[in-house]
Regions:
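Short Lys/Arg-enriched helix C-cap and helix-to-coil transition segments
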Residues: 195-199, 208
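Short, basic-rich loop-to-helix N-cap that marks the start of a DNA-contacting helix
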Residues: 190-194
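Conserved AdoMet/S-adenosylmethionine-binding subsite of the radical SAM
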Residues: 1-125
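Residue-level signature of tetratricopeptide-repeat
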Residues: 186-187
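Long, highly charged, low-complexity intrinsically disordered interaction regions
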Residues: 100-170, 204-221
């Protein structure tokens, strides 16, 4: 895809059209779906595109917001079943009135925040419109997207780790997919305390502000 919007394509690559980029994605997505049906019927049918399909977006060459970029990624995952969207910070290599100045630094931190948000879309059950909105269309450079979401929703915290469902645990800063699974499994054997959470892989220096164990906050809070 390279550029996140038709406006950017028209500005920097007028010979390219959005439809000419998306049509092959649609064809590949359809063929992958057909192939999955074939594999059910015929065990030895050859696999089509076993690694799936991916695309890349250039970040910082044009003026799209993080929200616009993330919404596009979300649609690509949903509609074309992409395996991965890659984000690449724009590195100025040529002088042009249409592009950032050669002295512009690549937006590497912004790239990193988009990768973090992309992970939340794919594995944590978030949507783009939960993470950003029209009033706040870009991520804070000093706060990761998951923590930013939690800070904006104090009414949802603290979460009691001994009772919260898996989907709720995933939204707690400092709790990842693996540690959420471990919590759900471990608490069947007994109530968990902060020491147990640390052993299960929870990053307590972040999670402690958003959780309770048996109704208790972490020491010092």
């Amino acid at each position: 895809i390279e550029l996140p919007s038709q406006q950017s394509l028209s500005l920097l690559a007028p010979d390219k059209k959005k439809e000419s980029i998306l049509r092959p994605m649609q064809l590949i997505s359809g063929r992958i779906e057909e192939n999955s049906t074939e594999l059910v019927k015929y065990r030895h049918a050859p696999k089509f595109a076993p690694a799936g399909q991916s695309t890349q977006m250039i970040i910082g060459a044009t003026r799209e917001t993080d929200l616009q970029i993330l919404r596009l990624s979300e649609r690509l995952y949903q509609k074309y079943r992409l395996k991965r969207v890659f984000y690449s910070a724009y590195l100025p290599v040529a002088e042009s009135p249409l592009l950032p100045a050669l002295t512009t630094k690549p937006p590497l931190l912004r790239e990193h925040r988009l990768y973090q948000a992309d992970w939340l879309l794919r594995y944590y059950g978030f949507t783009s419109d939960e993470l950003l909105d029209e009033k706040h269309p870009s991520f804070h450079p000093l706060v990761d997207p998951k923590c930013g979401w939690a800070l904006n929703h104090p009414e949802l915290f603290p979460v009691e780790v001994n009772r919260a469902p898996y989907e709720t645990l995933l939204r707690v800063p400092g709790i990842g997919v693996k540690s959420a699974c471990r919590i759900v499994t471990a608490r069947r054997q007994g109530r968990l305390d902060y020491g147990a959470l640390k052993k299960l892989g929870v990053v307590l220096k972040r999670a402690q502000y958003f959780i309770t164990c048996s109704g208790k906050l972490a020491d010092g809070l």
